[in-house]
Regions:
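Terminal substrate-recognition subdomain of acyl/acetyltransferases
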Residues: 1-21, 50, 54, 116-245
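A short linear-motif detector with a strong N-terminal bias
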Residues: 37-41, 67-71, 104-108, 203-209
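Flexible, active-site-proximal loop/turn residues at the rims of small-molecule/cofactor binding pockets
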Residues: 80, 98, 132
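Loop/helix-junction capping segments adjacent to catalytic residues or to phosphate/diphosphate-binding pockets
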Residues: 83, 101, 136
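Short, solvent-exposed secondary-structure capping/transition elements
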Residues: 86, 100-103, 119-121
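Conserved acetyl-CoA-binding loop-helix of GNAT-fold acetyltransferases
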Residues: 94, 99-115
Length: 245
């Protein structure tokens, strides 16, 4: 387990797949998140995926040092399918009182530093699927900051890049044989229903109007949008120095 040395409002700890969390600690993680996110069905999310803590390859937990409560989580898994390698951001939650703070940004930076160190570099492709426009907006902002990075779906493009569409279909097929993709919108019909249909009480809006409009127009309460950022060859030094420093 690795800790973030900058300890002010919270502590960050990273664990790899080799960890073995006691059942009581896993229950504490879920209970603390549910208490801190009372309008979200955290119990359903983890209850529908009982082996999820054993499945994550990478896990960051944010803890409030005062009460020793879990206040944030980012869990991910490495996937390899043929020549395609990608990092799937599986779970991302921050309790209500830390919304609009630096916590989520710090979790992401710390997480990517640890993944890069453990894996000998960042993956060429970072993936999530989400009902939340804020998550897509994070991918959009990340791709805009990294020279040569490619975003999918690109809401500013008249049509999606054909090779990114092919990649997106491979990714969805790798994640689940039961899911399908609408290639032009990035929509995965039923994606949220397959995970936790009652998790979100509502659709939160991001700071980007185009992103919000896309989600409102295409995403129902049972659906998700696939989000992908492909890094260009040679992007690693820039990401290390400018993004996850």
């Amino acid at each position: 387990m690795t800790s973030d040395p900058q300890k002010n409002a919270f502590d960050l700890d990273y664990s790899s797949r080799e960890r073995q969390f006691p059942e009581g600690f896993k229950r504490k993680i879920v209970a603390d998140l549910q208490e801190g996110m009372p309008q979200f069905d955290v119990l359903q999310y983890f209850g529908n995926q009982p082996d999820i803590f054993e499945t994550y390859d990478h896990l960051v937990l944010a803890t409030d040092p005062e009460g020793e409560r879990i206040i944030g989580i980012l869990g991910a898994k490495d996937f390899v399918r043929g020549s395609t390698c990608f990092l799937y951001l599986w779970t991302a939650m921050v309790v209500d009182r830390y919304h609009r703070t630096s916590l989520f940004k710090r979790i992401n930076q710390f997480f990517l530093r640890q993944v890069s160190e453990r894996n000998g570099g960042l993956p060429p492709l970072i993936v999530a699927k989400t009902y939340n426009p804020v998550v897509y907006n994070m991918f959009r902002a990340l791709s805009a900051r990294i020279p040569g990075a490619t975003l999918y779906p690109d809401l500013e493009a008249p049509r999606q890049c054909p090779d990114m569409v092919d990649l997106a279909r491979d990714v969805v097929g790798t994640l689940s044989a039961n899911l399908r993709l609408d290639a032009e919108t990035g929509l995965i019909p039923g994606g949220q229903r397959s995970v936790a249909p009652d998790f979100f009480p509502r659709m939160a809006m991001s700071s980007h109007a185009r992103t919000n409009d896309h989600f409102v127009a295409h995403v129902g309460s049972s659906d998700q949008i696939l989000c992908m950022v492909r890094l260009a060859p040679g992007a690693e030094p820039y990401v290390q120095q400018r993004i996850i420093r």
